[in-house]
Amino acid sequence: LKVLSTIHKIPFRALQRMTLLNPGAVDLVKLLAMLAMLLDHFNTLFLSPLRPELYALGRAAFPLFSLIWAINVNRKPERLQFQANRLWLWAVVTQPVFMLAFRQLDPWYALNILFVFAGTTQLLAWHRQSGTCGLAAGTALLAVLAWPLSPASYGLQGEILTVGLAVIAGSASAQVRYCAGWAVFLSLVTLNGASHLATMPVATLVFATLPTCLFPWMVVTAAQQLMADKHRRWLPARFFYPVYAGHLLLAGTIVYFV
């Protein structure tokens, strides 16, 4: 029984260790996540057929961005509504260029990834402001967003992943964080390619499921070791938003005219 209890706690302990990043390591993880995203979008938009190794590398981007988001929202919880407002603004501003870039691949109603973080930040803000009623309102908001987020931005699994990581990185009770750890683990396992496991089990495991789980852990572990003594940020504040919108604008323009 003791062995089983230890095994059950492995995913939670691994995820909890991943949230322990100093500011320098956070910036390195953010930079590598952006690189993975750029490679994935280049592969998706400009290569035919897709390169499976680039697809696999791209699976690390969303979990890493979610981890950085979870760490950031827990640093200044009193600013959650301000952070939500900023995310909603950037999500709306970015949506036209997202639609331009992916107009041939995703349906018109598909939302960009910033809506995931805007919705989950709004849930946390409402929960902080109004308790159970705020939590219910935030859950309803995420339920509404899940469908338009599904084609391109990970849908329900992505929402569960982000909220779960925020709980693990926060100050909730050990039991709540333990349950959140399992929710995060299950969302990671099903985040990419779960619908293809029955028909293409080997390819799905090698290029989707395992990279989604292992690559983020490898990146975070490397960042923790390389940046162990870097306790100051070295990237410009909030540089992700213009880079995200800008690369979509550039990619969309190329796709449209070429």
Where are these regions (language model features)?
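Alpha-helical transmembrane segments and their immediate juxtamembrane cytosolic regions
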Residues: 1-258
